[in-house]
């Protein structure tokens, strides 16, 4: 089984690659290695016979075509994307280039590759386009996003992902390319680049820096442990029906302030300090266009394909905090040289 994974040096991608290699799939990881791509996240699979790495930009059609022709994948799982909302506010160009144009390149290259396969291999081939619940916009106090929910993106990031979803759907409907789409809720877990909420709070707390909470901290997100997501992606690309969408969520809805408080309480327990970590919480100016609530209904994935999350938020966040406490070798170079925790996405100074 040969699987081409794009963005496999990123957070979700590296979790998927580690999982696929562990079940003896043959994996080609194609990654540009932007600031958020980190080969250190793949040390557990480095040098193994069933893992290969290709540094390439998904917008480079020549490189991507060569990857398809040389590796001859049975499945493609497309995760490569710019994903941080704050960065999209002040740097939308990169998001359009990678998330829209890059997805177009992947779809068109996959279509040409698939059309030239033998009938048996053609019937077996499938591509999974991995997306986000943010394409649906903001929910009120009730309800959950379903696969049929209308698209209503609020940020340049979510707009770029919505566009890429529409391209994937169009390539399936127009050309018959066997594409499946997944839309996930907020992921968390080990090897998470420290610009995102949970790793940023953990590492700022350990450095005794302020813990910046946007607005009042009342925005609600559904949290999905990254290894549960990796298992879901493998299941969807194998068993999902072309032309269908599958929402992937953890059924863990929490306000941002409650997430930060849980992290602080865990750090008080696992790495006690003279003062409580919660004293570092600081409320800051809200993000422009900050969606109030996301909630995923994963019933379709659970009932049709039999997926079930193994971690709830209590078990997953404990594993995550423990991992960061034990793995400074991974995150300290990032804090020192790549991103030290400064505020991103401000249109004007706070």
UniProtKB/Swiss-Prot annotation:
Keyword NAD: yes
UniProt pathway annotation: Carbohydrate biosynthesis; dTDP-L-rhamnose biosynthesis
Entry-linked Gene3D superfamilies: NAD(P)-binding Rossmann-like Domain, UDP-galactose 4-epimerase, domain 1
Sites where the protein binds substrate: 132
Record keyword Protein transport present: no
Protein keywords: Lyase, NAD, Plasmid
Positions of disulphide bridges: none
MF-aspect GO terms: dTDP-glucose 4,6-dehydratase activity
Entry's EC annotation: 4.2.1.46
Annotated protein name in UniProt: Probable dTDP-glucose 4,6-dehydratase
Organism: Sinorhizobium fredii (strain NBRC 101917 / NGR234)
């Amino acid at each position: 089984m040969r699987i081409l994974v794009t963005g496999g040096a990123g957070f979700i991608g590296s979790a998927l690659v580690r999982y696929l290699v562990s079940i003896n799939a043959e994996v080609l990881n194609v990654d540009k290695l932007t600031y958020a791509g980190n080969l250190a996240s793949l040390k557990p699979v480095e040098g193994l016979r069933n893992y290969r790495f290709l540094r390439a930009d998904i917008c480079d059609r020549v490189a991507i075509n060569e990857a398809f022709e040389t590796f001859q994948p049975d499945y493609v799982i497309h995760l490569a994307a710019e994903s941080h909302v704050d960065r999209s506010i002040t740097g939308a160009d990169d998001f359009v280039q990678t998330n829209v144009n890059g997805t177009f390149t992947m779809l068109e290259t996959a279509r040409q590759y698939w059309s030239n396969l033998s009938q048996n291999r053609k019937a077996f081939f499938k591509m999974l386009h991995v997306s986000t619940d943010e394409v649906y916009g903001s929910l009120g106090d009730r309800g959950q996003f379903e696969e049929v929910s209308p698209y209503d993106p609020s940020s340049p990031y979510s707009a770029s992902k919505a566009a890429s979803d529409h391209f994937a759907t169009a390539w399936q409907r127009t050309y018959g390319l066997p594409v499946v789409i997944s839309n996930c809720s907020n992921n968390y877990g080990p090897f998470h680049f420290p610009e995102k909420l949970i790793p940023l709070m953990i590492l700022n707390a350990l450095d005794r820096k302020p813990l910046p909470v946007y607005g009042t901290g009342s925005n609600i997100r559904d949290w999905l442990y990254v290894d549960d997501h990796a298992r879901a992606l493998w299941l969807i690309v194998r068993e999902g029906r072309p032309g269908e969408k599958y929402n992937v969520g953890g059924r863990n809805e929490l306000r941002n302030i409650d997430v930060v408080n849980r992290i602080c309480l865990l750090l008080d327990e696992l790495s006690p300090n003279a003062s409580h970590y919660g004293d570092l919480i600081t409320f800051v100016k809200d993000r422009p266009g900050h969606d109030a609530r996301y909630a995923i209904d994963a019933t379709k994935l659970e009932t049709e394909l039999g997926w079930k999350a193994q971690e709830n938020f209590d078990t997953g966040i404990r594993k995550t905090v423990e991992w960061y406490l034990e793995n400074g070798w991974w995150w300290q170079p990032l804090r020192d040289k790549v991103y030290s925790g400064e505020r991103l996405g401000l249109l004007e100074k706070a």
